[in-house]
Amino acid sequence: LTDFRYGEAARMQVKDCKVVVYQRLAKSIEEILRRHEIRGVLLEHENLTLAQADIYETVCKQWNAVPVKDTTLDTLLKEMRAVKTEKEIENIKAAQSITDAAFTHILNYIDTNKSEREIALELEFFMRKQGAEKIAFDTIVVSGTNGSMCHGVPSDKKIQKGDFITMDFGAVVNGYHSDMTRTVAYGTVSEAQKQVYQTVLQAQLAAIQTATSGIPCNQVDKAARDIIDVNYAGTFGHTTGHAVGLEIHEWPYFAPACQVITKPGMVITVEPGIYLEGKFGVRIEDMVLIQENGCENLTGSAKELLIL
């Protein structure tokens, strides 16, 4: 169901469903319920507005149809999306190839005359020129003390010698997303910075080494978190990773509470980080393809500490 503004685009993109262009949502729902004698309706949970949900429930009540409450459409969709087909994996790899190229490009662009915002724009422009239909999400570029904000917004702050620069970015190809984070240094770096970087790198490598089919997702999270917690407990507050596909954040997650069993064909990020408030932060992120024995790293960019 969509309105006139998106009708043509929906018909081009949606191949296995009938697209209904409505003028009045309630009337279109009513016609569908009546024509197909529908008695149970699954509602999308995360993005459906309360106003839209009220319309569905009101019309369902009029036609003795019941909105199903014990599950949601999201639940079914996320399970269907979790294991990627060969074509989906091909699209994700194509998006990551553009992302890797953007990282190589940006290393020669960064200097003390550039701001975080300018670096973010250059990454985005380069990816679009390389064939990305759009960027995967709002590009993150944070440096120096801004780096402790794990999802900080690029600012007008200029790069300074001694800064860590964290860049989190991705591309979209044929609707499929990529996601990568790299932290690089500009000029000289302190021993404390090097120690944090190596800890994050070791944590990420341990998690990737652990990732395989047939294990709980939280086992991968634990592999990374245990290494960070030895000397930096409390500085790694987000999950170790999330699935990627048609959306940038999909299910399942490499998270402490996620006991979902991994399956071959899942594409999930591995992105531990350490964030020292008011000082700096480090995050390293790759995407991995879960396989029967181990995983394939889809990210090609170097991740040893680069000092520009």
Model-derived segments and spans:
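Active-site neighborhoods and metal-handling regions in enzymes and metal-associated proteins
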Residues: L1-L308
